[in-house]
UniProtKB/Swiss-Prot annotation:
Keywords: ANK repeat, Nucleus, Phosphoprotein, Repeat. It comes from Homo sapiens (Human). One of its GO terms (molecular function) is transcription regulator inhibitor activity. Residues 218-228, 238-287 have a biased composition (Basic and acidic residues). This is NF-kappa-B inhibitor-like protein 1. PANTHER family: I-KAPPA-B-LIKE PROTEIN IKBL (PTHR15263), NF-KAPPA-B INHIBITOR-LIKE PROTEIN 1 (PTHR15263:SF1). PROSITE patterns: ANK_REP_REGION. Interacts with CACTIN (via N-terminal domain); the interaction occurs in a proinflammatory-independent manner. Detected in different cell types including monocytes, T-cells, B-cells and hepatocytes. One of its GO terms (cellular component) is nucleoplasm. It is found in: Nucleus. It comes from the Eukaryota. Involved in the regulation of innate immune response. Acts as negative regulator of Toll-like receptor and interferon-regulatory factor (IRF) signaling pathways. Contributes to the negative regulation of transcriptional activation of NF-kappa-B target genes in response to endogenous proinflammatory stimuli.
Length: 381
């Protein structure tokens, strides 16, 4: 009597064959829907694209080569860009060349800065540090140049001390500016002392810089020759003149801001009671001023009053520095100015203090000024 041969159940065999087919069919349907989503975006049918994604929430809005965000930037399609950001598109997503959406927006030139570059930067600031396969960041494509933290070290012996002091000073400035501009004034539960005024801050900064320069000069007097001592005294006089001009400009800017705030406060009250044209010393930072205390283009402390031509502002900064004969001191001075007017640092530090509708104009001027300073620094190498 022979044993019957084992047989595979018919249902199990059919199930094992159908599973890969159903998985492949599901993947194919999803890819077709994603292609349809991209076609709707390209044709400007944004309502249909949004409805498709609502019916099928599992679709990948970043799928495709180039990705939809890159296509919207290349076509200057601002509505499609806004829709993609609302639907959760990732500005840090890279295409086959390693470019992010910020790379694509930066390549469209100055016209795309406000409508494309700034929304992407606000959504994902960390994407500014992503490099493509050519080793470029979005800031380098815009011509901002690398931040000073990644620049090559100078060969002078005091370069490391200067860098450490600058980083420490920058951290203190950021903390003090947050207090001065009133970020925490709205918290009524913490009654603190009055914040330091802008003029007091600028005077203290000038004093600290002067003390540091005096200390360096005293340390170097023993090793320098008499001709070098004469050159150092001229450089010191130049620095004193620069500090005096900086303090005067800071006081003038503070007076101008004070008058502007007083005018806006008077307009808000409907001229119910007369007020002097200038606020008293206790009205430098009125509490509850709201958006009336935000900067406009003319309120930014430009090197030249009211801004103007970037080349002229850069030339004015260079003219206030050490003479051309002192190459080392002039390079150090230009490095400080490059850090102060670098677009990344400026945007990180002062974005919340500038009117939204003025942000594009201000950042355009800061970018042009930074590029002009970079050219002056390159000319000294």
């Amino acid at each position: 009597m022979s044993n019957p041969s084992p047989q595979v159940p018919e249902e199990e065999a059919s199930t094992s064959v159908c599973r890969p087919k159903s998985s492949m069919a599901s993947t194919s349907r999803r890819q077709r829907r994603e292609r349809r989503f991209r076609r709707y975006l390209s044709a400007g049918r944004l309502v249909r694209a949004q409805a498709l994604l609502q019916r099928h929430p599992g679709l990948d809005v970043d799928a495709g080569q180039p990705p939809p965000l890159h296509r919207a930037c290349a076509r200057h399609d601002a509505p499609a860009l806004c829709l993609l950001l609302r639907l959760g598109a990732d500005p840090a997503h890279q295409d086959r060349h390693g470019d992010t959406a910020l790379h694509a927006a930066a390549r469209q030139g100055p016209d795309a800065y406000t409508d494309f570059f700034l929304p992407l930067l606000s959504r994902c600031p960390s994407a500014m540090g992503i490099k493509n396969k050519d080793g470029e960041t979005p800031g380098q494509i815009l011509g901002w140049g690398p931040p000073w933290d990644s620049a090559e070290e100078e060969e002078e012996d005091d370069a490391s001390k200067e860098r450490e002091w600058r980083q420490k000073l920058q951290g203190e400035l950021e903390d003090e500016w947050q207090e001065v501009m009133g970020r925490f004034e709205g918290d009524a539960s913490h009654e603190t002392q009055e914040p330091e005024s802008f003029s007091a801050w600028s005077d203290r900064l000038a004093r600290e810089h002067a003390q540091k320069c005096q200390q360096q000069q005293r340390e170097a007097e023993g090793s320098r020759r008499p001709p070098r001592a004469e050159g150092s005294s001229q450089s010191w006089r130049q620095q004193e003149e620069e500090q005096r001009l900086f303090r005067e400009r800071a006081r003038a800017k503070e007076e101008e801001l004070r008058e502007s705030r007083a005018r806006r406060a008077q307009e808000a009250l409907g001229d119910r009671e007369p007020k002097p044209t200038r606020a008293g010393p206790r009205e430098e930072h009125p509490r509850g001023a709201g958006r009336g205390s935000l900067w406009r283009f003319g309120d930014v402390p430009w090197p030249c009053p009211g801004g103007g031509d970037p080349e002229a502002m850069a030339a004015a900064l260079v003219a206030r520095g050490p003479p051309l004969e002192e190459q080392g001191a002039l390079r150090r001075y230009l490095r400080v100015q490059q850090v102060r007017w670098h677009p990344d640092r400026f945007l990180q530090r002062f974005r919340s203090q500038i009117e939204t509708w003025e942000l594009g104009r201000v950042m355009g001027a800061v970018t042009a000024l930074s590029q002009a300073l970079n050219r002056h620094a390159e000319a000294l190498k």
